[in-house]
Amino acid sequence: MADLEKILERLGISPEKRCQVIKKEQVVRNMEKIFLGRDLSNRLLYTLACIAPKNADLGLLADLVDARVIKHESMLKECLRYTEKKDVSMEEMTRFVKRNEVSSEDVRKFVAKMRSDRVAKKDMVSKARKAMPCADFRVVVEEINKVPDDVDGGDEKRPLEGGWLEEGEIKKLPKPSEIPQINEEIRQAHLRRTGGRVVTRFPPEPNGILHIGHAKAINLNFEYAKKFGGYTYLRYDDTNPKNEEAEYFDSIYEDVRWLGFEPYKVTASSDYFDKMTEFGFQLIRKGKAYVCHLSQDEICERRRQYVSDGTNDRSHLSQYRDRPVSENLRLFQEMVDGKWEEGKACLRFKMDTDTKNPLMLDLVGIRILDVVHPRKNVKYTVYPTYEFALCVSDSLEDVTHSFCTREFYTRQESYNWLLVQLEIYKPIQWEFSRLNISNTVLSKRKLLPLKKYGIELDDPRLFTIKGMRRRGFPPEAINQFCRSLGFTFAETTVDVKKLENFVRDNLNRTSRRIMCVKEPLKVTIMNSTPCSISIPDLPGSSVVRDVPFTPVIYIEKSDFMEKGDKDFLRLTPEQPVGLYMLYPIRVVKVTPDGIVAERWDGVPRKFIHWVSEDSVEVEMRMYSSLWTSFSPKDATYLEEMNKDSLKVFHGLCDKRISDARIEDRFQFQRIGYFCVDKDTTKENIVVNLTIPLKNIA
């Protein structure tokens, strides 16, 4: 038995698994036969011992494994099935193996075919196993893991790459060459400039940081252009400098790149202010714009009266509407020259007021603002409005598909009207529903008041891009979530659990495992000596790291119960427990200083994690939802905040966390997924709970 235990240890079998193996008489007998005179380090021989039925020809199969004819478990299982029904020779078995071998190239081709056949990733493994039972399963899994994820931790589907853009109304959008234009000359000139490629833009206003809703728009714009071989601008809508700050320009660019997207070019509406001023003069000359001296409040009141009177008397909109063109040109030039004060004059569009659309009631196109532009560091005399800048910037950048959220639908008419009057290229507009997510708020108007509670915009409890990044959400998971939603006109609220499923699934596959105890309980093991054990970074990973073991360890306080009950499966004075990757222990006595235990040779009911005496202290910030209600109400969302959404523990981690860097992600076994916070220093590692495990043992 001692020799067998050494063989198992040499094969890298974990201590708890060794305890189980030596209790299985059939496996022990198989191992004694198989390893006699053969390579004791061959893990496949151990597999044969574990899976071989009683009547198997162990000698023949072991010889084939030892000779490296059978090289992996899948082929071994097929050989076992083949030999079940008849006696075969070494030569026949060798021919069987050669005949059924599946190369890595064959696996790659089969996975590629499944992708082209639109097989969901969750179904690929079973299909591959059925079609290629003799293929090396590790190679199959490696190839399938290269496929973009299409299934989360539950049953919700993620489309294959590009597939999410081929469903619903979005797949009906016209090609660049099919987009209606004022005339064919404009269309052909545009196609020459772009080469007929799709051009999109993501146009955020630099007055705050991005959130999960923006991530959906970013994915749409960048991925739609990519699908058709096009490109995407990142364009700052910087037409409202009083609400904008220089820091947000850099912050937005950083967030877009962190999500994995690289803009074709970074621009701003302000890059085209001079051109928009020229267009202002052009519209005046066409009789489509005039200088107005009404205040903003007066303009709103005049519009209200115009709609309520129902007389269609356009002079109600402004007494300045019918000024002569020459006077409008002179006054607008005075505005440009800085001769008018803020609020004393603006340029309004002379629009088609027969429509019922309130955004066609002579919009303000250019106004005077007494402020220095935060990006240009220039004090412009006149500033175009959002309504003017959006469509003109889209046209000047040859944007083919202008994507906006549904609330901008009413702006479509004014957008097209302006481009027609200017006789320039006209993109197609397409609206989609805004992303609302449960148990949170997203608007800047609601987020800024949180500062008085000590909650900044990058707080891990918020669903801003920076908040999610700090919490440890992988950008790939955020993108997959956004692409899973599809596009509809109906506005709904998505359960945050859907996003969490994507995050958990990603972290389960990618995050290094660490042992950590949140509330340490000291255990002294009497009959033990210091040693070092090798633990893989991930289950099945070839990358292993050494973890020191000392006679004094710490376990989770909740893993011990002085007076246990029948449902408690971990350590009690009467019930031993196994230590992960080590051996079982049992309690000798309980003292004020902790537990005194000793090594035990039995088979425990449960294994628990632990850390050694020289472990690393970490500050654990255990976050939960900032709002417990599914949809926080506008009027009471501050009162609805969860006052217990952050709890701080000072836990102990094994030595593997010593080299952690900010934003590194880990799975703390049996606790959850964590991310190293930016507050970390050399003296103090701070980690944020990203998301709990689905089932905490």
From Swiss-Prot:
Q: Name one GO cellular component term.
A: cytosol
Which residue numbers does the motif 'KMSKS' region cover?
A: 441-445
What residues form the membrane-spanning segments? none
Q: Where does ATP bind?
A: 205-207, 211-217, 405, 434-435, 442-444
Q: SUPFAM superfamilies in the record, alphabetically?
A: Nucleotidylyl transferase, Ribosomal protein L25-like
Q: Name one GO molecular function term.
A: ATP binding
Give the GO terms filed under biological process for this record. glutaminyl-tRNA aminoacylation
Coiled-coil spans are none
Q: What is its EC number?
A: 6.1.1.18
In the UniProt record, does the keyword Aminoacyl-tRNA synthetase occur?
yes
Domain of life where this protein originates: Eukaryota
UniProt: L-glutamine binding residues: D237, Y386
- Per UniProt, the short sequence motif 'HIGH' region occupies residue numbers 204-214
| One Pfam family this sequence matches | tRNA-synt_1c_C
Q: Is tRNA processing among this UniProt entry's keywords?
A: no
Q: What keywords does the record list, in alphabetical order?
A: Aminoacyl-tRNA synthetase, ATP-binding, Ligase, Nucleotide-binding, Protein biosynthesis
Q: What catalytic activity does the UniProt entry give for this protein?
A: tRNA(Gln) + L-glutamine + ATP = L-glutaminyl-tRNA(Gln) + AMP + diphosphate
The enzyme's main class, written as a single word, is ligase
Give the similarity note. Answer: Belongs to the class-I aminoacyl-tRNA synthetase family.
Note the PANTHER family from the entry: GLUTAMINE--TRNA LIGASE, GLUTAMINE-TRNA LIGASE
Q: What is this protein called?
A: Probable glutamine--tRNA ligase
